[in-house]
Amino acid sequence: MRQGSIKWWAQWHRAHHRYVDTGLDPYNARRGLFYSHLGWTIFRRHERDWDVDISDLENDPVVVWQDRYYYPLSLLACFGLPTMIPWLGWADWRGGLYFAGLCRMVVAYHSTFAVNSFAHWSGSQPFSKTTTARDNFIVGLIALGEGYHNFHHEFPTDYRNGVRWYDLDVSKWVILLLEQLQLATNLHKVSDEVIDSCRRQYRQEKQLPPADTFSADHGEVPPIEWDEYVQQAESGRGLVAIAGFVYDVSNFVDRHPGGEKILKTAMGRDATAMFHGGGHNHSLAASNILSTMLVYVIRGGGRVELLNKKEKQSQ
């Protein structure tokens, strides 16, 4: 489709999710419909402005190879083959170049751009209003399912966009087929309980504080001393402290939308500020997912990272 290499596209997509609706968002919908649809291709933001972890991409041999040879590969796939096949088959290279090459590329471009623009401009928001992302059925038709964008922004690691069985999400069905053919692995699917909880809380407009939201469904949580929490984290256990609670994120590290690096830096620390806007202002859905990983409550409420830094500076 000639929309950038895997590495380029994934980096911009991750930046969009991390900085959504802010000045660092590459497709910032708050700058207007034109900017989010086409303007960003003209007034491009350089990748150096972002703090986005792409170490997994840089260590993937397929991604590295495709990025290195992206231009000849894209020219061959987007123009070479569409021109050559009609030329060899029925002597119509002009029709192949125009319809299968140029026209197809224009349609594909605007179908994808519609997700950045119209799916942030018009539609329903069944999961959250914290971002401009919306579920737009028309965009879903055009972009083969990508229009269920409110769900995608709330649950960015889920391979689905249309979560209901009757949602028109061709991308989801193709990915499932690829899994059956063993061409796709490690598909992540958010549990129905977490999705229903997010939808229910949003409908009831109960934006509970982190401690209440996280502990409501867990009954008695065993206490732990701050030093013991730090010791366990330093010994290799994936523990993160947020608002006086400790979460075991060991099985979530490789699925963290912001990348492994930023989550690992939070281990053994008070990550309250990071979770609530310092690193990324996480959604209600993220809070619900986090609540399933609760393992301890810190005795006395824990440490505040800012005060901890001041103590170290004074020593």
Language model regions located:
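Cytosolic juxtamembrane regulatory segments of multi-pass membrane proteins
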Residues: M1, D135-G147, K206-A211
